[in-house]
């Protein structure tokens, strides 16, 4: 009668677990669908942002020439892009043509006249310049033009990148007054000048330099401007990129201090391009730059080598060379093997038809009985199979309880011992295992020498349970 009562209670528990399992499956499906929806929304939003940004840059950079030496966007494009002039994408006539050519087309004159009052102060007096415009650096220019007089530039910007103005004719005028370049834009962007010829200025930069470093987008005084060569801004131009020399002016001692470059600069291009200015590549950096760069690379290589050296060292510590330590390690794994073999023996007696018991533990036997009893085609419970498995479970648990095994305490302790001590990595020799090498007395001595006193009593109980099960089925205690 007590067996029927326990069977009914177990059956109700199994049905309850089935319902909980179905609810958990539904919850997991909802969570997965929610995560997939979030991922799809993020991917779609990111794609829209990137495509819109690159499309806007492509439209701003595209401007067909309408007059010789003057590049003006179409009226429709100007209407759609009202900020193109602010971005410096509207290019005006070359600097020399503005000053020397008395006649311009009506379209060009309308744009040049408002700048006439600005061009003369540019060459004779102080001019305010901003360096917030990034498009001026995209204009290819010759690196040989330098100033003869004191200038005030922002960090990371040289005169070549500030002017950035290859012109259709030679520019021989020299700047005879100091220039003030506040942070915000470059000279090319403030003038809006683009050219199709070469810029030839033979003067050299010999005056004092004052640096303004209040621009939020520029690097500090001791650093340089980091330029990404894979940026869509660079890909929008059809001409090679001229990277300025990596020299930061020093306002104290008037000496250009080279800094370690942060980007790989473009190789110098041989020859001239038709319709564009001649590109004379960046000046070679000093030996200090090479030394610092090589020092950083060498330090990185040392870190990688050190990491590779430490990794096998940690792995080798798991297998000590000392024979005494090796014996201790084997004894610890024998403790875990005893607990593992007891779990495996219990599961094999309940599920003898299963070869692999991955995911099966004594703690989840009721749940595994339900899973094994469900028909995979119609998901109906096979009551006969469920009853058979339940009887096996009740029989072996009653046998172990007579030895002192507690179904609420010892399954968790078994898992703890396996996780703490591990199991044997390799199968012992077949003759040794069958010849009685792992006897009860030997394994008891191992437990006494290895297990902590707080767990020793339970560990000895697990060993006695394993010995009883092996005696009942006539097999060795360690089944491989």
UniProtKB/Swiss-Prot annotation:
Keywords: Coiled coil, Cytoplasm, Cytoskeleton. This is Speriolin. Belongs to the speriolin family. Transmembrane segments: none annotated. It comes from the Eukaryota. Signal peptide: none annotated. Found in a complex with CDC20, CDC27 and TUBG1. Interacts with CDC20. GO terms for molecular function: gamma-tubulin binding. It comes from Mus musculus (Mouse). Residues 2-45 form a coiled coil. Changing residue 314 to Q: Abolishes CDC20 binding. Pfam families: Speriolin_C, Speriolin_N. GO terms for cellular component: centrosome; cytoplasm. Expressed in testis. Expressed in pachyten spermatocytes, spermatids and epididymal sperm (at protein level). It is found in: Cytoplasm; Cytoplasm, Cytoskeleton, Microtubule organizing center, Centrosome. Residues 252-297, 305-324 are annotated as: Disordered. Disulfide bonds: none annotated. InterPro entries: SPATC1, Speriolin_C, Speriolin_N. Residues 1-76 are annotated as: Necessary for targeting to centrosomes. The keyword Disulfide bond does not apply.
């Amino acid at each position: 009668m007590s067996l029927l009562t326990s069977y009914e209670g177990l059956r109700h528990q199994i049905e309850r677990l089935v319902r909980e399992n179905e609810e958990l499956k539904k919850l997991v499906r909802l969570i997965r669908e929610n995560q997939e929806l979030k991922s799809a929304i993020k991917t779609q939003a990111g794609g829209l942002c990137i495509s819109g940004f690159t499309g806007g840059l492509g439209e701003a950079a595209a401007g067909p020439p309408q007059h010789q030496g003057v590049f003006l966007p179409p009226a429709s494009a100007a209407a759609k892009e009202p900020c193109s002039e602010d971005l410096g994408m509207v290019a005006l006539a070359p600097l020399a043509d503005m000053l020397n050519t008395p006649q311009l087309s009506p379209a060009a004159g309308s744009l040049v006249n408002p700048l006439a009052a600005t061009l003369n102060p540019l060459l004779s007096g102080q001019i305010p310049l901003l360096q917030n415009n990034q498009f001026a650096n995209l204009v290819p220019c010759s690196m040989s033009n330098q100033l003869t007089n004191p200038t005030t530039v922002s960090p990371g910007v040289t005169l070549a990148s500030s002017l950035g103005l290859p012109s259709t004719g030679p520019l021989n005028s020299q700047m005879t007054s100091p220039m003030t370049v506040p942070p915000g834009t470059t000279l090319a962007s403030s003038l809006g000048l683009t050219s199709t010829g070469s810029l030839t200025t033979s003067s050299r930069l010999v005056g004092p330099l004052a640096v303004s470093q209040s621009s939020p987008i520029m690097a500090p005084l001791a650093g340089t401007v980091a330029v990404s060569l894979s940026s869509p801004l660079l890909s929008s131009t059809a001409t090679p990129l001229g990277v300025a020399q990596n020299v930061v002016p020093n306002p104290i001692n008037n000496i250009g201090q080279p800094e370690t470059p942060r980007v790989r600069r473009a190789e110098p291009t041989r020859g001239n391009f038709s319709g564009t200015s001649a590109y004379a590549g960046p000046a070679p950096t000093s030996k200090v730059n090479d030394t610092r760069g090589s020092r950083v690379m060498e330090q990185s290589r040392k870190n990688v080598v050190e990491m590779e050296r430490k990794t096998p060292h940690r792995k080798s510590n798991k297998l000590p060379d000392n024979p005494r330590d090796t014996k201790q390690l084997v004894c610890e794994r024998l403790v875990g093997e005893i607990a593992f073999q007891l779990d495996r023996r219990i599961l094999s007696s309940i599920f003898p038809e299963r070869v692999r018991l991955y995911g099966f533990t004594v703690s989840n036997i009721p749940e595994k009985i339900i899973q094994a009893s469900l028909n995979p085609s119609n998901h109906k419970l096979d009551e006969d199979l469920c009853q058979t498995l339940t009887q096996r479970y009740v029989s072996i648990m009653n046998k172990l309880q007579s030895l002192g095994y507690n179904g609420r305490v010892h399954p968790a302790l078994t898992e703890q011992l396996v996780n703490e001590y591990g199991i044997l990595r390799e199968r012992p020799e077949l003759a040794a295992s069958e010849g009685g090498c792992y006897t009860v007395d030997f394994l008891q001595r191992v437990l006494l020498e290895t297990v902590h006193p707080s767990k020793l009593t339970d560990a000895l109980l697990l060993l006695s349970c394993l010995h009883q099960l092996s005696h009942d089925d006539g097999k060795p205690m360690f089944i491989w």
